[in-house]
Amino acid sequence: SYINVLREANQIAGTYSTDEALFSSPEAYKAHLNGQYIDWADELLQTGVTQNYSLSVSGGTEKTKAYFSLNFSDEQGQFTGDDYKVYSTNMRIDHEIKKWLSVGVNMQGSYVYRNKAYSRFINSLVSVPLGTVYNEDGSINVTPVPGDGNTINLLLNQDKSVYRDNNQNFKLFLNPYIEIRPFKGMTIQSRLNASLGYDKKNYFQGIGSYQYYASDGPNASGTSASVYAQIDQNRSYNYKWENIFTYNFNIKKVTSWNHNQTDKSWQKQDNIKNNSYLWHNMDGTGIVYSNYTMSKGLGLVGRINYSYLGKYLFSASVRQDGSSRLAK
């Protein structure tokens, strides 16, 4: 038990005198005598539940083939307030317009929304397990042991009006192609690999959060530097365009062009006076940061294979690449 651990530790250190002296305050000792103990791990943890749903359809004709799927995943984590949702889709269409002409496209998209709990599980192992978690009216005790400010209630951040940490992520991949077969043995394929990405993180710790009382004391009131909101945004756009010329699998030429760009922004503001706005009402007094990167590249590849008498294979290739990242 907790009291036995305290006794043993103090006896080993040679500092044990009385049970009451083991506690940080008379109020904490009183809570022990009244049997007011808290299992912090049990209060923070919950049974995790995962749900997965999927729907797919496929079909086609002699010249057309298609596939479509929808997927949804909902995960409730082991910490109260931790959840993770994923929506995704996949679509593919291939169509032969003429015997010498085919087109197609493959598209994949996903949207992820996650709420992250303030899951400092280590705190549940080292926090004093004394007192009561809730007041008689059902509200959360800031200090589980009244009058003893040495322990702050670990459940404060389960209130979404004082603490939020969520992420949103969107990704789209698009891969169209066209294939031309002008004469026997000759194939020309042009394909595009494009992707869009958007990631946003919203964070808020307000008046009444665990960090607020841990930083400013259990009797804190009003705003302070520990009350702040933060937004991180990342946008990316990339594509690669390839043209592949093949003749009898012996001669191949590839041209490749790629473009990559990323736009990042970050904003933070502290001393927020009203929890109601969360991160939605920042003014010009906060910290703002932005960054933009872009690069382009071009590649040329040629390859010739020649087989003689079915015994000897001769191969020659050449490649040349250029990138804006290498520019002086």
Which residues make up each language-model segment?
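Surface-exposed loop/interface segments of Gram-negative outer-membrane beta-barrel transport/assembly proteins
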Residues: 1-37, 77-84, 88, 92-173, ...
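Outer-membrane beta-barrel channels and translocator barrels
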Residues: 50, 61-62, 98, 181-183, ...
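Structured alpha-helical segments in the cores of large, soluble enzyme domains
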Residues: 53-59, 298-308
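Repeated loop/turn-to-beta-strand initiation elements of outer-membrane beta-barrel proteins
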Residues: 63-66, 100-103, 185-188, 311-314
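Transmembrane beta-strand segments that form the barrel wall of outer-membrane beta-barrel proteins
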Residues: 70-76, 315-323
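Solvent-exposed loop/turn segments connecting transmembrane beta-strands
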Residues: 78-81, 324-328
